[in-house]
Swiss-Prot record:
Gene: Arp2
Residue numbers binding NADP(+): 25, 45, 71, 98, 162, 166, 195, 197
Family: Belongs to the short-chain dehydrogenases/reductases (SDR) family.
PANTHER family: OXIDOREDUCTASE, SHORT-CHAIN DEHYDROGENASE/REDUCTASE FAMILY (AFU_ORTHOLOGUE AFUA_5G02870), SHORT-CHAIN DEHYDROGENASE_REDUCTASE FAMILY PROTEIN
Alphabetized PROSITE patterns for the sequence: ADH_SHORT (PS00061)
Keywords associated with the record: NADP, Oxidoreductase
Function: Hydroxynaphthalene reductase-like protein; part of the Pks2 gene cluster that mediates the formation of infectious structures (appressoria), enabling these fungi to kill insects faster. The product of the Pks2 gene cluster is different from the one of Pks1 and has still not been identified.
The protein's Enzyme Commission number: 1.1.-.-
Disulfide bonds: none
Active site: 147-148, 162, 166
Listed name of the protein: Hydroxynaphthalene reductase-like protein Arp2
Pfam families noted in UniProt: adh_short_C2
Sections of the chain in a coiled coil: none
Length: 267
């Protein structure tokens, strides 16, 4: 597991906005940024209580945080999210677009509603989050988008919708990095493999050879850990630590990249 050594407060004075930060990977990212001294805007869509719990956890690290409700699939809500963040903290230095959803369906069964739900959150929302970040970030800021190992993975059935929604984000990343360069803003994407979250609990069996619904979680973890040289499945803290590096001034020469976060897993 990730170690618990004391973390230097290398992001003191920075302000970060993390979408979907009330749980899962987003929570892990928000906490790691806060441990390093950043003030954090914890965005959530519907579950206020978990988001406020993240704010409370951040306060225990000595950093500041605020929870702001916004449905990021709606552009006016994205605009309001950024305006409220700026009113609360005065400026923004780091924006992490994390929210996402996953659907596994045979191609012939995918409906327009399925398509719109996945692409509205995984793809369209990330475009407009990045657009607003570009406008509002101070010079030298950081944008981190969320792709997935699925964007370049073959051999997984019923996966076209999710894989396609994440592949588009990788194209955004490379183009945005060019467009944002004059403000010295870097734009990167991370592409995690399996990470222990509620989405993992619901869908990870699809990635296990001969996996089936209702598999015990211990079997799923063991099956996926077998692909990883480190012998385990990722936890949100693992992802948060990489994002914390990308948010740091030392990461400036990492730009326009998609960073695969799988612990070396080969599938």
């Amino acid at each position: 597991m990730a170690s618990s050594e004391e973390t230097p407060r290398s992001l003191t004075g920075k302000v970060a906005l993390v979408t979907g930060a009330g749980r899962g990977i987003g929570k892990g990212i928000a906490l790691e940024l806060a441990k390093r001294g950043a003030s954090v805007v914890v965005n959530y869509n519907s579950a206020e209580k978990p988001a406020q719990e993240v704010v409370d956890e951040i306060a225990k690290t000595g950093s500041r945080a605020v929870a702001i409700k916004a449905d990021i699939t709606k552009v006016p809500e994205v605009s309001r999210l950024f305006q409220e963040a700026l009113r609360h903290f005065g400026h923004l230095d780091i924006v992490v677009s994390n929210s996402g959803t996953e659907v596994f369906k045979p191609e012939e069964e995918v409906t327009e509603e399925d398509y719109d739900r996945v692409f509205n959150l995984n793809t369209r929302a990330q475009f407009f989050i990045a657009q607003h970040a570009y406008v509002h970030l101070r010079n030298g800021g950081r944008i981190v988008l969320m792709s997935s190992v699925a964007a370049n993975m073959s051999g997984i059935p019923n996966h076209a919708l999710y894989a396609g929604s994440k592949a588009a984000v990788e194209g955004f990343t490379r183009s945005f990095a060019v467009d944002a360069g004059h403000k010295k803003i870097t734009v990167n994407a991370i592409a995690p493999g399996g990470v222990k979250t509620d989405m993992y609990d619901a869908n990870a069996w699809h990635y296990v050879p001969n996996g089936k619904p209702g598999m015990p979680m211990e079997e799923i973890d063991k099956g996926l850990a077998a692909f990883c040289p480190l012998g385990r499945v990722a936890v949100p803290q693992d992802i948060g630590r990489v994002v914390a590096f990308l948010a740091h001034p030392d990461s400036e020469w990492v730009n326009g990249q998609v960073i695969l976060l799988t612990g070396g897993s080969v599938t």
